[in-house]
């Protein structure tokens, strides 16, 4: 299995730090299961994660699930296994608390899904707005995005941690940020890309709407008033934001 771990890591385009992280987590996984994958061994491994914090557990589960899929895809495993996080964040918690989603900025097999998630999380955009984003809407000199919708124009500041992932997409051919043969992708494509990315990060409970809610909570924490936030979101009225300011 050690060779399988090395082959798996080599198959992914990872930074040095990410390679070390994957290797450490999967080596730990190997030691616990003894190189044999079955339901009992996986249950034993999952039990061993109880001592770790939720963020660390999610990282380890993500690495192991990707590795298990790799083994299944190659035919090494005859049965498909997938570990689930037992301590799920409830919908109530998601609505009321800012989540630690720093793993969204790490390596992924779904770069389009990651960019969609980060555009929602960082700018509060809806999937429909993202689907219509033109590269000309971005000013990379001043790091701003201009969006015009329903005769309302808003200027959004691009966060520094979003730029590396965004610039990579802006350098590709085409007028739209996301397009195929000059045409925008379907709504189902955006949904699938985002879902695949969220599954990879063990955040299956999240949706585009809940990611947008994270943007709202963060902006409120940063001191934005209800009126200011409604302008950032392109809302005609701030009424729908009232519940966040009670």
Swiss-Prot record:
Compartments it resides in: Cytoplasm
SUPFAM superfamilies reported in the protein's UniProt record: DNA breaking-rejoining enzymes
Cellular component terms (Gene Ontology): cytoplasm
GO molecular function, one term: tyrosine-based site-specific recombinase activity
Positions annotated as active site in the UniProt record: 149, 212, 244 (o-(3'-phospho-dna)-tyrosine intermediate)
Stored CDD domains: INT_StrepXerD_C_like (cd01190)
Domain Core-binding (CB): 1-72
Keywords: Cytoplasm, DNA integration, DNA recombination, DNA-binding
Alphabetical GO biological process terms: DNA transposition
UniProt domain Tyr recombinase: residue ranges: 84-246
Function: Putative tyrosine recombinase. Not involved in the cutting and rejoining of the recombining DNA molecules on dif(SL) site.
Family listed: Belongs to the 'phage' integrase family. XerD-like subfamily.
Protein name as it appears in the record: Tyrosine recombinase XerD-like
């Amino acid at each position: 299995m050690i060779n399988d771990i090395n082959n798996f890591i080599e198959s992914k385009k990872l930074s040095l730090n990410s390679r070390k992280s994957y290797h450490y987590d999967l080596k730990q996984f190997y030691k616990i299961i003894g190189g044999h994958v079955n339901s009992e061994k996986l249950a034993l491994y999952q039990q061993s994660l109880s001592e770790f914090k939720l963020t660390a557990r999610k990282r380890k589960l993500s690495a192991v699930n990707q590795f298990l899929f790799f083994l299944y895809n190659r035919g090494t495993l005859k049965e498909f296994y997938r570990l689930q996080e037992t301590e799920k964040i409830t919908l109530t918690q998601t609505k009321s608390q800012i989540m630690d989603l720093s793993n969204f900025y790490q390596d992924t097999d779904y770069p389009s899904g990651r960019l969609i998630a980060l555009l929602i999380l960082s700018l509060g955009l809806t999937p429909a707005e993202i689907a219509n984003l033109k590269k000309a809407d971005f000013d990379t000199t001043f790091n701003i995005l201009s969006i015009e919708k329903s005769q309302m124009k808003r200027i959004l500041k691009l966060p520094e941690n979003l730029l590396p992932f965004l610039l990579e997409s802006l350098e590709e051919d085409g007028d739209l940020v996301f397009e195929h043969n000059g045409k925008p992708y379907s709504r189902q494509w955006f949904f699938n890309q985002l879902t695949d990315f969220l599954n990879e990060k063990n955040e299956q409970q999240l949706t585009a709407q809940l990611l947008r809610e994270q943007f709202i909570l963060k902006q409120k924490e940063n001191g934005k008033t209800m009126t200011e936030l409604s302008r950032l979101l392109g809302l005609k009225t701030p009424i729908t934001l009232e519940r966040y300011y009670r």
